[in-house]
Amino acid sequence: MKIIGIGNAIVDVICKVEDNFITANNLTKSTMKLVDESEFKKLLSNLKIEETISGGSVANSIVGLSQLGNKVGFIGKVNEDNLGNKYEEGLKKENVNYFYSKKKEELPTGTCLILITPNSERTMCTFLGTAGKINENDVDVSAVKNSEITFLEGYLWDKGDPKKAFEKAIKNSNKVAMSLSDLFCVKRHKPHFLDLVKNKLNITFANEQEILSLINTKNFNEVISFGKQLGKLIVITRGEKGSIAIHKNEIVECDIQKNLKVVDLTGAGDLFAA
């Protein structure tokens, strides 16, 4: 298998909102906030659902890789409930090998409320549910060892058990790629993420804000120097400034495609990683 992903198995619930909904609910635009089930339901109670689809950061990337013709797999925990069944069906429909056997869990399948504002930005409120209970016993070691690359998400560090799954996957992987996931996620786990990037990852994906925060700088030239010294591949998205890939002394920059109508930025970074 080319690539296996391990991440939070989340069902995305997409709703359109005005900017004042974000501020009124003390949310920070364009970021992800962890919420409990009651807060999730409270937020959703005043909204109209536009779409419900299988999601999760790494899962989105894995689906993208499948659509590009790669043989891929995914490990993520869902409950044996209606949403969990739909999640598995969604992955299989996209030709993703799903290496997890559902069973009845105490918590429901994880859900993410994705709030789309008029400028097409997305703000996420995630109730991890069963997804946040993934542990080392859920990692299919054979599937990991038989994959060229294991792709992980920084969000796995937000709970205790998933960290063990993360570490087991790294131990058994041929090559490891990781997305830093979110600016606040980087801030929560900065020392751990910096150690991972320097010592354990082969490929790192980040946006400009995340990588600046990780190395404690406001100067992007310092990011370039860091990338050169790192000696491993680091790929950074920079919004309107395009993207850049750094590997030792080799730097490749890509401009954005202009005059596109942006409808929804949900999963944009995930598909870029694919």
Regions found by a protein language model. Give the residues of each.
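Glycine-rich phosphate/adenosyl-contacting loop at the front of the ribokinase-like
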Residues: 1-75, 85, 262
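Conserved phosphate-binding/catalytic loop of the ribokinase/pfkB sugar-kinase fold
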Residues: 99-104, 114-160
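A glycine-rich helix N-cap at a beta->alpha junction
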Residues: 90-107
